[in-house]
Amino acid sequence: GTIVLPDSMNLVAKVDIKGPEYKAGLRLKEGKGAMDVNAALNTSTEVYKADLKIGNLQLHNFLPKDSIYELSLSAAANGRGLDVMSYHSFAKLNLSLDQLHYAKYHLSNLNLTGDLKGALVTAHLTSDNALLKMTTDAEYNLAHSYPDGKITVDVTQLDLHELGIMPQPMKRPLTFNLAAEARRDLVSAHFVSGDMKLDLSARSGVNPLIRQSTHFVDVLMKQIDEKALNHAELRK
């Protein structure tokens, strides 16, 4: 949408450079809302840090054509090394979403922590609000040329009616648990929701599995077009 700069906005920015050390600061004030950003980088050591604080900022004043309103959040990051695939790089991230009003949705109590060490990224995400109560843990190895990671998602409450997916309120909120893993020669997934259970396991990596699945679909669609199913060919 169109970005508008409100007349009531006040912006102050500061940049300081001393040899390999770079520092920057920014403060934005608009009505009752404010945003503060501070960042520092040493290009010699590749050590960096940054923090962001947004309090009750009315985003609709900047994006009047979009249905996005109040935002409050805080974030902090620090680390060393600009090559995320290097085993010598490390980083930490903490993000907390205190309030986000988008359309009819009100999100709050959303927290994300992330770490990078030895090319391994780990993340922990929690959500505790009326729309979604959830915990997610994930990890992914950036150094490998093939997908290599795992994720677990535990949803204890998901309101599909409030999200506009279900026309009527549900008697009980949706809950489910998902655990998935991808390695060089293994892909597995386990899904449980109420009485429904689904398990997937393949003795191949993600890329070979995608190629095999694509080939299977191509052969199947060809047989459907020719109106002649060949089960032996499909099993190859």
Question: Which residue stretches match the model-derived regions?
Answer:
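Interface amphipathic segments
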Residues: 1-236
